[in-house]
Amino acid sequence: FVDAEGYTHAPASESLFGSALPRPAGKIDTQTSYIVPLYFGLFNEKNKQLAIEHLKEAIARSHNTLTTGFIGTPYLNLVLSENGYDELAYTLFEQTEYPSWLYPVLQGATTMWERWNSYTIINGFGPVGMNSFNHYAYGAIQEWMFAYSIGIQRDEKQPGYKHILLQPRIGGSFTYIKGHYDTVYGRVESSWNKSDKEYTYQATIPANTTATLYLPVTDPSKVIEN
């Protein structure tokens, strides 16, 4: 009963939250403070655009590095790509300065760490009280990698990958991306190549499934199907 009563107030709470203006710079102006409500669709359309701009400014202030923790990191690149900022998402993904996904790799990481600096070549190991070297949280970036970089997404209206959304976002310094996902119906494969003259995209879906393909082009007449 308590849960049911709480849910009845959810739309009103969402409306109240969404109509509140995002705070100006310097007042609770963190990356996560914008990422989470943007991901869950809590802002109205006017304030959504303001929140996106505030988020971009917050990222710029940190010199295109992450200031998010376990709550904001999983949604950061998803929010950027869902709102058309794929290049910024790729910039964060390829960042090597601290704190970033690739910074630990340059320090010798072969797993996901609990901290961005669990170990550094210069300073050695971080505090033992919070320093797991096998910690999933920051590895949540793989959802963005599958959904937008590789371009394989589930259709929530047809669960189980009966219908598949293929939506590759070509960007960053990459010239080639390939990946697959094994569904209950079989393997979905998606890959793209980028050259100076053209983009090439290939996909394979299992038998007895369908897919909708979204390509990042502005002129459909330039799309050639093979």
Stretch-by-stretch model annotation:
Residues 1-125:
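Catalytic cores of carbohydrate-active enzymes
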Residues 87-226:
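Non-catalytic C-terminal accessory modules of carbohydrate-active enzymes
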